[in-house]
Design a protein with these regions (language model features):
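C-terminal catalytic/motor cores of large multi-domain enzyme assemblies
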Residues: 1-198
């Protein structure tokens, strides 16, 4: 939850990170959203739900925790609706029909016309699409950006581990560290802006 808050605060301080390219046009978002996938159960073939959380500028760590826990609980316990319900319907379609429906959705995406019920809970349309690989005991990776939606930042959070570090006074100490892999759409800002943001 600390990482989610840190990512959101960084984007508030570096607003160009909250932009995206769609249909060969540049857009600036009005709000910061963080999206991820929540498994219903930690099992190989468990269903997944898509979750998007709005990040107000003044939120606290307690609010982050309540919002994340609440959204994940809802995603795991309630019947799928919105984009999750649409995905349940789409996966039952014959392949030719599915291919046609996907073509329509991708065309709507190009023109920025994807319906709200498909967009609002889809992490592909969030400011940042996060994956917490540490929750399944995996290290961080550099995840590709998707060719659908408007998410310009992918963040993969790894496992928390112990690492020996040298403190400011020269002494050695063992601290908890976590690696995070960020993949960024280089069209929204230059390397200098990204480097200063990270």
């Amino acid at each position: 939850h600390c990482i989610l808050m840190a990512v959101a605060k960084t984007i508030y301080l570096r607003p160009q990170l909250n932009s995206f390219i769609s249909g060969r046009r540049f857009y600036q978002r009005d709000e910061i959203t963080l999206g991820f996938v929540a498994k219903k159960r930690f099992e190989d073939h468990s269903e997944e739900s898509l979750v998007v959380i709005s990040a107000p500028e003044d939120w606290t760590l307690t609010e982050v925790t309540h919002r994340v826990v609440g959204k994940v609980h809802k995603a795991r316990t309630e019947k799928n609706d919105g984009v999750n319900g649409a995905m349940d319907v789409l996966k039952k379609l014959p392949r030719p029909v599915l291919a046609f429906v996907i073509w329509i959705i991708k065309t709507l995406d190009f023109f920025g016309k994807v319906p709200d019920f498909l967009r609002q809970d889809d992490p592909n349309f969030a400011t940042v699409f996060l994956t917490n690989l540490g929750s399944i005991k995996c290290p961080s990776v550099y995840h590709h950006l998707n060719n659908y939606g408007s998410s310009s930042i992918m963040a993969a959070i790894g496992t928390i581990r112990k690492s020996e570090k040298i403190a400011g006074d020269g002494s050695r100490e063992v601290r908890d560290v976590v690696d995070i892999g960020f993949t960024l759409d280089e069209r929204i800002a230059d390397g200098f802006y990204f480097a200063r943001s990270l």
